[in-house]
Amino acid sequence: MMSDMEELGGRFVRDVVMKGTNANIMNAMQRCVLALYTYDDNPEDISPENVLRQSLELIAKLPEIAVYSYHAYRHFRKDDTLFIRNPQKGLSLAENILLMLRPDGKYTELEAKVLDIALILHAEHGGGNNSTFTTHVVTSSGTDTYSSTAASIGSLKGPRHGGANLKVQNMFADLKSHVDQDHWDNEDEIITYLKKVLNKEAFDHAGLIYGMGHAVYTLSDPREVILKRFAQALAEEKGMTEEFELYNRVENIAGKLIMEHRKLFKNVCAKVWTSTVDLYTACLVFRKNYYSDLCYCTYAGLECSPLGRTD
């Protein structure tokens, strides 16, 4: 059923996605979602049945919008080659994302499985996070599905929410510039760098080790535990076990450092935005570093869906 809802149509891609490209893909997705309102024959109907239809269509179309917006950004802003590949019926959302994203359209079964699991776990993340709560607040006014979804994508973009995973990736890139690859197994050098981060002497000088700490979970984030296992298998498939071990080492060290620095008496665990999840997905599933711009955009359609209005 979902595969029948995926295609945007050439007119929409040409007239909306490819024109007026944004510097940020999340803003491009907001614009495209609002434009879908004009392609809906019944956009204002907020009955449960119609909202369900609209939400399913958005979930099916947003990965395509994200990938196409990314390609438009790379072409018009970075002068890269532009290629557009249509989704194939019968493939999962994750498989179509990888098919449309990569120049050769190739991916392994494990890559698709890891991305599929990541999409599902993000979609199942309850209704209490910032973007989902935004959906509840905006829909309570009686507005249309497209307006509420666009608002939620705006929330997800923020660096204290979905945008935090880009901070994680940038932080690890900065760490690698300070700790040579030959020393990735040297805990003392990693500790020195992380202490500088906490003391606002390194990275973005915010004093935060991104990807660590959760408002509810202390011992572990169950989503992170699940995805970490698959990320390790993917690292082995791609010959990146050394990098996986670096991320794992930082995770093990950072929690203790944060507890000491802030004088906390509760455990600090890695959360689902940490390197052990989204950074692995970005580096291993998406392969190229510049795909990191797209990483959290792929979750937007699932996390921001206004299905909660039908509760």
Locations of regions flagged by a protein language model:
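Hydrophobic alpha-helical bundle cores within soluble ligand-binding/oligomerization subdomains
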Residues: M1-D311
